[in-house]
Curated annotation (Swiss-Prot):
Residues that, per the record, bind NAD(+): G446, P447, Y448, G449
Broad class of where this protein is predominantly found: plastid
InterPro entries with a match to the protein in the record: Cyt_b245_heavy_chain, FAD-bd_8, FAD-bd_FR_type, Fe3_Rdtase_TM_dom, Fe_red_NAD-bd_6, FNR_nucleotide-bd, RBOH/FRE, Riboflavin_synthase-like_b-brl
Gene Ontology terms: cellular component: chloroplast; chloroplast membrane; plastid
The UniProt record lists the keyword Zinc: no
Species for this entry: Arabidopsis thaliana
Record protein name field: Ferric reduction oxidase 7, chloroplastic
Length: 747
C-alpha cells in the first residue's frame, strides 16, 4: 500500500464527516425556524382573538366557531376549550419539540455576536423606580399592551351593555340595577381573560418559560402583576352584584344561592373570599415581614380554582383551563421530585455566619451557573421550602452542587445550630452511637434558572453584588475559568466584579471559590478585577488578613445513603419532560371526551357546578394517571442511567469535587502563581459610585456590548439600572453599551 493512501483516505472521511455535519446542521436549523414560525403564528392569532373577544366582532367569531365545532366529538365545552386553552397547549407541545431539537447547551461564539453594540428590549431599563421596580423595554411594551386591552375591554363591554339595555326594554326603576349587575358580569369576564395568563409564570419548570428563556425567579413578578389585576376585576365583579342585591333587598338570599343550572353563587363567594385572602397576604409589606403567613395562605389557590369551576361550570372554566393544566403538570412533577431525600456531602460555616452546603447530584443533571434550588431540611420544618442560588458551576464536578446560605431568620438560625451540633458530634465520634448522631435530612426541588447560560453571551461582564448576592457570581467565575482552562468556547475575556458589603467579616465569602486552583495563571486567560466596598467600616480590622479561614472546617456527614437529587424536574431531560407533557395532554383530552360521551351525554347531566367539578377531576386524574405513568418510566430510566454513570471514570474527592491533574508546566509554575488578591481592591467607608465606574470603562473597553448582572437588594438594582439607562441614552459611538440583567429572587 502506498504511504500516501492513508492520509488521503483520512481526508476523504473528514470531508464526508464535515459534509454530513453541515447537512445535519441545516436540517436542524430549518426545523427550528419552522417551529418558531408556527408557534409565533399560533400565539399572535390567539392573543389577537383574546383582545377582540370583548367586542362584537370577537363575539361573532366565537359564535361562528361554536356553530362549527360544537357538533363534533368535543361538544360545546370542547369548542370553548379548543379556542381559549388549546393554542397554549399546542404551543407548549411544539416548544418541547423545539427544545429537543435544539439540544442540551447553547454555545456562544464570536460569530454569533454583532459587530457593533445594539440595544436589546429585554436588557434596556425603561422604568427604574416605582411600584413595578426595574422594568425593561420589553416588559414596558407588555404592560402597555395589557393596559390598552383593559381600557378597550371596558369600553367594548360598556357599549354592549347599553345595547342590551335597549334590547330588553328594562323599566326605568330597574335600569340602574340591571346595568350594575351586567357590569359586574363583564368585570368577571375580564378577570377570567386575565386568569388565562395567571398560572403560566409560576410553573417553575414550565416549557413555555424555557422556550423564551425567562427563569422562574423573573416570571414571579409577572404573576404578581397579573394577580393584582385579576383580583381587582374579580373584586369589582363581586362588588357590583353585592351592591345590586343590597338595593333589591335580596343580598343574603342570593348570596347563598347554589343553582343547578346556571351560575352557582355560593361557590363564587367562597372562591372570591379565598382569592381576597391570598391577595391581601401577598401585598409587599405582609409578604416581606410575614412570609410564612403569605406562603401558607397562598395554598388556598386550590380552594380558589376548584370553587371557581363550581361557580361558572365547565363551559366558562375551560377558558382558563390551559394555564391551570400546565401548572398542575409542573406541581405534580415537583411533588414527585421533592419526595427524595438528598445527601449532604459536606457542610461548613464561615466567620460571617454564612453556611455552605454541598449536596449530592447525579452526573446527568443539567443546570447553568445562574441556577437556584428550593431546599427543605426536615429536622427544621416539614413545610418550609427556601430558595438559594447555586454557588457552584456545573463544571466544578458531576456529582455535587453547592449553595451558600446567609443566616438571617429563624429557619437559617436553626440550620446553623444544627450544623454546630453536627460539628461537635464529629469531634466526639467515638462517644456517640449511630442512632443518636445528629442528622441533616434535605429535600430539593430544582434546579431552575435560565435555559441558556446568558453570561457567556458577552465578551465583557460587570458583576454587581450586594452582600450574599455574590453567591451566583462565584458560579459564573468558576464556569468561565473552567472553560478557559479546558479550552472550551467561552466569550467572556474581561470581568469586573463590584461587591458592596457592610462589614469586613463578609470577605470570608471569598474562600468559597479558589480561583488559582481552578485555572492556573488565570490572568493570562481572563482579565479579572474585583472591587470590594466595605460600607460600614472606615478602616480594616486586624483580623482582615485571615478572612479566608473558616470557623468550622468542612463537616463530612457519616450517614449518607447514596441518594442524590432527582432529575425528574421540568428543566431536566428534554425528551422525558416533553413526553410527560404530550402524553398527559392527550390523556386529559381523551378522558374529558370519554366522560362527555359515556356519562354526561348518556345520563343527560345538566348541572353546571357538577360538570365543572368533573372537568377539574379529569384535569387532575389525567396528570396522576398518564403523567404518573411517564414519571414511573422516567424514574426507572434515571436509576439505570445513574448506575451506568456511577461506574464511570469520574474522579471525585471527599468534597464532591472532580480532581484536576495539572500539567508539568503548571506544577512547575505553582510557586510563582499570582494570588487573586493582587487583582482585588478593597475600599472602606464608601459605596460604589456606579457613574464613575461605568465612565471608567468607556476608554478601557471601547464600543462593545457589556453585560451587567446585578444581584442584591432592590435599591442596588434601581441605582445600577438608573445609571445604565442614563449612560445608554447619552452614550457616544465609541463607548460601551451596557445591558442590564437582574438575578435577584423575590417571591
Amino acid at each position: 500500500m502506498d504511504d500516501h493512501e492513508t492520509p488521503l483516505l483520512s481526508k476523504d472521511l473528514s470531508s464526508s464527516s464535515s459534509s454530513s455535519s453541515s447537512s445535519s446542521s441545516v436540517v436542524v436549523s430549518s426545523l427550528k425556524w419552522i417551529l418558531k414560525v408556527v408557534m409565533s403564528v399560533i400565539f399572535v392569532t390567539w392573543v389577537v382573538f383574546l383582545m377582540m373577544y370583548p367586542g362584537s366582532l370577537g363575539d361573532q367569531i366565537l359564535t361562528n366557531w361554536r356553530a362549527i365545532s360544537s357538533n363534533t366529538l368535543f361538544g360545546l365545552t370542547g369548542s370553548m376549550f379548543l379556542i381559549f386553552s388549546g393554542p397554549i397547549l399546542v404551543i407548549a407541545i411544539l416548544a418541547s419539540l423545539y427544545l429537543i431539537i435544539s439540544g442540551e447547551e447553547t454555545v456562544f461564539t464570536k460569530k454569533k455576536i454583532t459587530k457593533f453594540p445594539r440595544f436589546r428590549l429585554w436588557t434596556f431599563p425603561v422604568l427604574v423606580d416605582g411600584p413595578f421596580g426595574v422594568v425593561s423595554a420589553a416588559e414596558f411594551l407588555g404592560i402597555m399592551v395589557f393596559s390598552v386591552f383593559f381600557l378597550w375591554a371596558i369600553y367594548a363591554y360598556t357599549l354592549r351593555n347599553l345595547n342590551v339595555l335597549d334590547y330588553f326594554h328594562v323599566l326605568p326603576n330597574n335600569r340602574s340595577i340591571f346595568l350594575l349587575e351586567l357590569t359586574g358580569l363583564r368585570f368577571g369576564m375580564i378577570g377570567l381573560l386575565c386568569m388565562v395568563f395567571l398560572f403560566l409564570p409560576i410553573s417553575r419548570g414550565s416549557i413555555l418559560l424555557r422556550l423564551i428563556d425567562i427563569p422562574f425567579e423573573h416570571a414571579t413578578r409577572y404573576h404578581v402583576w397579573l394577580g393584582h389585576i385579576t383580583m381587582t376585576f374579580f373584586s369589582l365583579h363581586g362588588l357590583c352584584y353585592v351592591v345590586g342585591w343590597t338595593i333589591q333587598g335580596q343580598l343574603l338570599e342570593l348570596l347563598f344561592e347554589w343553582k343547578a343550572t346556571g351560575i352557582a353563587v355560593l361557590p363564587g363567594v367562597i372562591s372570591l373570599v379565598a382569592g381576597l385572602l391570598m391577595w391581601v397576604t401577598s401585598l409587599h409589606t405582609v409578604r416581606k415581614n410575614y412570609f410564612e403567613l403569605f406562603f401558607y395562605t397562598h395554598q388556598l389557590y386550590i380552594v380558589f380554582v376548584v370553587f371557581l369551576a363550581l361557580h361558572v361550570g365547565d363551559y366558562l372554566f375551560s377558558i382558563v383551563a390551559g394555564g391551570i393544566f400546565l401548572f398542575i403538570l409542573d406541581r405534580f412533577l415537583r411533588f414527585y421530585q421533592s419526595r427524595r431525600t438528598v445527601d449532604v456531602i459536606s457542610a461548613k460555616s464561615l466567620p460571617c455566619g454564612t453556611l455552605e452546603l454541598v449536596l449530592s447530584k447525579p452526573p446527568n443533571m443539567r443546570y447553568n451557573a445562574l441556577s437556584f434550588i428550593f431546599l427543605q431540611v426536615k429536622e427544621l420544618s416539614w413545610l418550609q421550602w427556601h430558595p438559594f442560588s447555586v454557588s457552584s458551576s456545573p463544571l466544578d464536578g458531576n456529582h455535587h452542587v453547592a449553595v451558600l446560605i446567609k443566616v438571617l431568620g429563624g429557619w437559617t438560625a436553626k440550620l446553623r445550630d444544627q450544623l454546630s451540633t453536627l460539628y461537635e458530634a464529629e469531634n466526639q465520634d467515638q462517644l456517640i452511637s449511630p442512632e443518636s448522631y445528629p442528622k441533616i435530612t434535605t429535600c430539593v426541588e430544582g434546579p431552575y434558572g435560565h435555559e441558556s447560560p446568558y453570561h457567556l453571551a458577552y465578551e465583557n461582564l460587570v458583576l454587581v453584588a450586594g452582600g450574599i448576592g455574590i453567591t451566583p457570581f462565584f458560579a459564573i467565575l468558576s464556569d468561565i475559568l473552567h472553560r478557559k482552562r479546558d479550552g472550551k468556547d467561552c466569550l467572556p475575556g474581561k470581568v469586573l466584579v463590584v461587591w458592596a458589603i457592610k462589614n469586613s467579616d463578609e470577605l470570608s465569602l471569598l474562600s468559597a471559590i479558589d480561583i488559582p486552583s481552578i485555572c492556573h495563571f488565570f490572568s493570562k486567560k481572563l482579565n479579572l478585577e474585583i472591587h470590594i466596598y466595605v460600607t460600614r467600616q472606615s478602616e480594616p480590622c486586624l483580623e482582615d488578613g485571615m478572612v479566608h479561614k473558616v470557623v468550622h472546617p468542612s463537616v463530612k456527614t457519616p450517614w449518607t445513603n447514596g441518594c442524590s437529587m432527582s432529575v425528574l424536574v421540568g428543566t431536566g431531560d428534554n425528551i422525558w419532560s416533553g413526553l410527560y407533557l404530550i402524553i398527559s395532554t392527550i390523556g386529559f383530552i381523551a378522558m374529558i371526551t370519554l366522560v362527555d360521551i359515556f356519562y354526561i351525554n348518556k345520563y343527560n347531566i345538566t348541572t353546571w357546578w357538577y360538570k365543572g367539578l368533573l372537568f377539574v377531576v379529569c384535569m387532575v386524574a389525567s396528570v396522576l394517571i398518564f403523567g404518573g405513568l411517564v414519571v414511573v418510566f422516567w424514574h426507572r430510566w434515571e436509576h439505570k442511567t445513574g448506575e451506568v454513570e456511577a461506574n464511570g471514570n469520574d474522579k471525585v474527592d471527599l468534597n464532591g469535587e472532580e480532581t484536576h491533574n495539572p500539567s508539568a508546566a503548571e506544577l512547575k509554575g505553582l510557586a510563582i502563581e499570582e494570588d487573586v488578591q493582587n487583582y482585588t481592591t478593597i475600599r472602606y467607608g464608601t459605596r460604589p459610585a456606579f457613574r464613575e465606574i461605568f465612565e471608567s470603562l468607556n476608554g478601557k473597553w471601547g464600543s462593545v456590548d457589556v453585560g451587567v448582572i446585578v444581584c442584591g437588594p432592590a435599591t442596588l438594582q434601581t441605582t445600577v439600572a438608573k445609571e445604565i439607562r442614563s449612560h445608554s441614552i447619552w452614550r457616544s459611538a465609541n463607548h460601551p453599551l451596557f445591558h442590564f440583567n437582574s438575578h435577584s429572587f423575590d417571591l
